[in-house]
């Protein structure tokens, strides 16, 4: 579960390495986000020469969480880290590569470009 002030690793090559959550989108009183949810973030660490700069406010979709997510068959999926992918307004990723596995829940939320770029879908 991701909430305000949570720091996440960025799992793409957009230039950002770490982001800080500002807001969870999807409802006025929504406090937490899980895999497949869109959040508003600020870039805290960035690589030189990247598309995204430090201090920039961006939107991102969560692709991995430590707390895990419950699936419809009753199983749970969890990862070793909290990670996100920076996206544009049309849900397409700003980077051209995705690093590490992503959860299958992204396919249900119509993030097909991220699913197709990912090396592994769990």
UniProtKB/Swiss-Prot annotation:
<dbReference type="InterPro" id="IPR000218">
    <property type="entry name" value="Ribosomal_uL14"/>
</dbReference>
<keyword id="KW-0687">Ribonucleoprotein</keyword>
<dbReference type="GO" id="GO:0070180">
    <property type="term" value="F:large ribosomal subunit rRNA binding"/>
</dbReference>
<keyword id="KW-0694">RNA-binding</keyword>
<comment type="subunit">
    <text>Part of the 50S ribosomal subunit. Forms a cluster with proteins L3 and L19. In the 70S ribosome, L14 and L19 interact and together make contacts with the 16S rRNA in bridges B5 and B8.</text>
</comment>
<keyword id="KW-0689">Ribosomal protein</keyword>
<dbReference type="GO" id="GO:0006412">
    <property type="term" value="P:translation"/>
</dbReference>
<dbReference type="InterPro" id="IPR019972">
    <property type="entry name" value="Ribosomal_uL14_CS"/>
</dbReference>
<protein>
    <recommendedName>
        <fullName>Large ribosomal subunit protein uL14</fullName>
    </recommendedName>
</protein>
<dbReference type="Pfam" id="PF00238">
    <property type="entry name" value="Ribosomal_L14"/>
</dbReference>
<comment type="function">
    <text>Binds to 23S rRNA. Forms part of two intersubunit bridges in the 70S ribosome.</text>
</comment>
<comment type="similarity">
    <text>Belongs to the universal ribosomal protein uL14 family.</text>
</comment>
<dbReference type="InterPro" id="IPR036853">
    <property type="entry name" value="Ribosomal_uL14_sf"/>
</dbReference>
<keyword id="KW-0699">rRNA-binding</keyword>
<dbReference type="InterPro" id="IPR005745">
    <property type="entry name" value="Ribosomal_uL14_bac-type"/>
</dbReference>
<dbReference type="GO" id="GO:0022625">
    <property type="term" value="C:cytosolic large ribosomal subunit"/>
</dbReference>
<dbReference type="GO" id="GO:0003735">
    <property type="term" value="F:structural constituent of ribosome"/>
</dbReference>
